[in-house]
């Protein structure tokens, strides 16, 4: 009985992350639909340049690069030197990689972005 309750709580916590009520709003869903409608990189550049500030876009790109480097087992020092990210940002991205919704890893696999370090 205890094991069942523990498993249910763990699943509920995972579902809670996936269905964050603060994030899952009609406005965010509409934004994601807009992103999914883009057909190429040029359209992405146009859209994101209109929607985001340059600093917001650069921050997103930096986090993506940090995540890639963390998955390649680079050190915080190497990552900070290459990307200019603070250790707080690197830690935040690392937490997402380890306890998040697997969004980074899903994209990395689809884009074949990680070096073959497992061999």
Stretch-by-stretch model annotation:
Residues 107-119:
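Intrinsically disordered, low-complexity basic tails/linkers immediately adjacent to helix-turn-helix/homeobox/MYB/SANT
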Residues 31-38:
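Short, charge-rich, low-complexity alpha-helical interaction segments
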Residues 43-62:
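Short, Lys/Arg-enriched anionic-surface-contact patches
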Residues 78-83:
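Short alpha-helical "recognition helix" segments of helix-turn-helix
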Residues 87-110:
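C-terminal structural segments of small proteins and small subunits
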Residues 60-74:
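Short, amphipathic alpha-helical "recognition" segments used to contact nucleic acids or chromatin
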């Amino acid at each position: 009985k205890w094991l069942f309750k523990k498993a249910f709580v763990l699943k509920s916590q995972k579902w809670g992350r996936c269905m964050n009520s603060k994030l899952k709003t009609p406005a965010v869903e509409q934004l994601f639909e807009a992103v999914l409608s883009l057909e190429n990189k040029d359209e992405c550049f146009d859209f994101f340049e209109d929607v985001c500030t340059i600093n917001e876009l650069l921050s997103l790109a930096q986090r993506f690069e940090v995540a890639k480097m963390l998955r390649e087992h680079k050190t915080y020092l190497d990552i900070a030197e290459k990307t200019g990210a603070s250790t707080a940002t690197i830690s935040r991205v690392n937490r997402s990689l380890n306890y998040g919704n697997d969004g980074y890893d899903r994209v990395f696999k689809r884009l074949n972005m990680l070096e073959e370090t497992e061999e």
